[in-house]
């Protein structure tokens, strides 16, 4: 299988998000890369499904709760920006203060 660097990056994001989701299901508190991977994968898949930018910005803020992450992580992540491919083109999705 030959993958472009862009495709390799997307695959790595999805693998990291899968690992993070399994850890979260076991009750393990998530670290910075795991949180970013989960939010990024959520946005990429939502764009692929045809959801709107606004809808993804809103749902991205509700994805992870403060008690699911390690101490100090909510203060470290102010924005998550993802360039996602929508049916009508590529758009930048920004999730502000993603951990509530």
From Swiss-Prot:
Its main location: cytoplasm. GO terms for biological process: urea catabolic process. It catalyses: urea + 2 H2O + H(+) = hydrogencarbonate + 2 NH4(+). Coiled coil: none annotated. InterPro entries: Urease_gamma, Urease_gamma/gamma-beta_su, Urease_gamma_sf, Urease_subunit. GO terms for cellular component: cytoplasm. Its EC number is 3.5.1.5. It holds the Pfam family Urease_gamma. The keyword Hydrolase applies. It is an enzyme of class 3 (hydrolase). Pathway: Nitrogen metabolism; urea degradation; CO(2) and NH(3) from urea (urease route): step 1/1. It comes from the Bacteria. One of its GO terms (molecular function) is nickel cation binding. Heterotrimer of UreA (gamma), UreB (beta) and UreC (alpha) subunits. Three heterotrimers associate to form the active enzyme. PANTHER family: UREASE. This is Urease subunit gamma. The gene is ureA.
């Amino acid at each position: 299988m030959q993958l472009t660097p862009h495709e390799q990056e997307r695959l790595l994001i999805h693998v990291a998000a899968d690992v993070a989701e399994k850890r979260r299901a076991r009750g393990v508190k998530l670290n910075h890369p795991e949180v970013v991977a989960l939010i990024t994968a959520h946005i990429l898949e939502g764009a692929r499904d045809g959801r709107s930018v606004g809808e993804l910005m809103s749902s991205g803020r509700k994805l992870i709760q403060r008690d699911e992450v390690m101490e100090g992580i909510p203060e470290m992540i102010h924005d998550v920006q993802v360039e996602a491919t929508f049916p009508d083109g590529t758009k930048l999705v920004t999730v502000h203060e993603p951990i509530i």
